[in-house]
């Protein structure tokens, strides 16, 4: 099992979700909109000085699905090269015995 975490500018949220859901129809995820933070280029605070915000998507999924998500995110990154788009993968345990 793999934990997938995507943190990205909210401007690409719809594109990310549309592609992931079309390629992995049974995907389960948690979406956190309105995420504040600071990346390499800018802050995202949702205020008058730094008006943009991020979103965060977390999913626990198979290695096969994680590879699909990696491919999708590479495509999104090429389509939107100036947006802050990051994604991470961590091996996860289903249960502790």
Regions found by a protein language model. Give the residues of each.
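Positively charged, small/polar-rich N-terminal and surface patches that mediate targeting and assembly
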Residues: 1-97
């Amino acid at each position: 099992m793999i934990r997938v975490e995507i943190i990205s500018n909210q401007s690409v949220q719809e594109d990310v979700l549309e592609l992931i859901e079309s390629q992995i129809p049974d995907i389960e995820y948690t979406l956190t909109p309105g995420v504040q933070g600071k990346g390499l280029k800018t802050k995202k605070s949702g205020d008058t000085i730094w008006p943009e915000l991020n979103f965060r998507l977390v999913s626990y999924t198979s290695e096969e699905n994680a590879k699909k998500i990696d491919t999708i995110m590479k495509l999104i990154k090429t389509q939107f090269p100036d947006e802050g788009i990051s994604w991470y993968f961590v091996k996860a345990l289903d249960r502790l015995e």
